[in-house]
Amino acid sequence: MKKFTKILLIGCLLVMVSCNNWLDVDPKSQVKDKDLFASEMGFKEALSGVYSLMTKEGLYGKELTFGWLGVLGQEWTSVPYNYEDDQKYDFENAASEVRIDSVWTGLYNAIANANKLLKELEGKENLFSGDNYSIIKGEVLALRAYLHFDLLRIFGASCAVGMERIAIPYVTEYAPTIFPQEKVGDFVGKVLKDLQDAAKCLENDPILTGRTVSEIDDNGYLMNRQVHLNYYAVKGLMARVYLYKGDYANAEVCAKEVIGSGCFEWVKQENLTNESVADLTFSTEHLFALNIVTLGNIVDKYLDGGNNSFALEESRLSEYYGSSYDYRYLYLFKTGVGMSNTLRYLKKYDQLESVSWAQSYRNKLPLICLPEMYYILAECRYHSSGDVLEPLNEVCRHRGVADLSEADLSAFETLLLAEYRKEVIGGGQLFFQYKRLNRSVVPGTDVDLAGEGRYVILMPKEELENLGWVSNQ
């Protein structure tokens, strides 16, 4: 039995956030889940398990944020030695193959978990109180879409290259079935269908309705919606997907809905200046963030100056930001010590020790944020001859830098990518922007990614042995 089928069989809710013996797994890895899915609490735990899978270092806990995708986006000038080939877009080596296999398997495993949950939800509305059934279902559909979309952005051609290109499977069932590969356009259509269904399920999400939720309401289950794929996170993700597709009209509609909601506030400089209690991830701007309880340990291993750390030369950092008044330049990097004193290390994810440090700042790794909505709006307006400067300058004004001018728009794509780089460094999104626009070169390398076909990562070789599958490149 091939690996892909095995993922579908054993990807059954393998982790849990707060319970060590959450599952009873027999030697054949079959989950005894009758009790788990007999109560609303069991479904809540299962959903937490899907989010927890995403926090692993092989996925968003490192590789799909500041790690592997950060390297592919040329975000760092100094990388651990086992990423040096990836930095050159050479994936024909053992370290890269292990990393790619981990990403592929991890994302499809999380999707299998989501599909299992959706299957178990069928016909069990009577188990749930209030709006929890539809909200949980909406989150799971959104998770399935989110995970698939990132698989496509890694292992599929961009929409700009060809909607008819063969990509990868879109898995919608929990079953030992090998799903067929989809064309890029069809795959994106399925992502959007899941997101549209998710948004409908989330119409009673408190973040949308404005309903106040406290600890006495179902133990506060619907509090802290920004660490769940909430209604506005779904709309933000839809804006991202529509933009990737080149559907600027719908991307603009979704981005404007998020911006107009008033639910997300720009970080205030006063919350950045005190290093012991700073809001380093700009938490008020999060549409969706993961809560990673081991984030401090991850930072210590990879972003704190050791041999396995990712870092930037000060000269490159200054080149990126241009202004020493930029909040991101001022507050989000720390200087290396000793022989590393020319290097700058990202401190966005640092876990501060002060007891006064706000709980809402802790353990947060953002995946969708407010500034992206303004960049999407600007790009959509660029294609419709609208006011491009206003949304770009809205971000500038909340980052402590001067407004851009009409003269800056002479090379719009280059400008936009430079603004993205300032904002999303360490977040795993920059590589995808260059791929989406099919730019030949990512600054920091002379490899012709578009011309040499390096933007599409080859799926694990073992998967190509599956009957009927062809190369995704």
List the model feature ranges, each with a label:
Residues 1-29:
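Bacterial Sec-dependent N-terminal signal peptides
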Residues 19-70, 255, 442-473:
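Membrane-proximal, proline-rich intrinsically disordered regions
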Residues 227-229, 246, 250-367, 423, ...:
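Hydrophobic-face positions in mid-chain alpha helices that act as interaction patches
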Residues 44, 83-155, 177-185, 195, ...:
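Conserved, well-structured interaction surfaces
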Residues 34, 63-78, 157-164, 168, ...:
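Short, surface-exposed recognition loops and adjoining beta-strand edges that mediate ligand/DNA contacts
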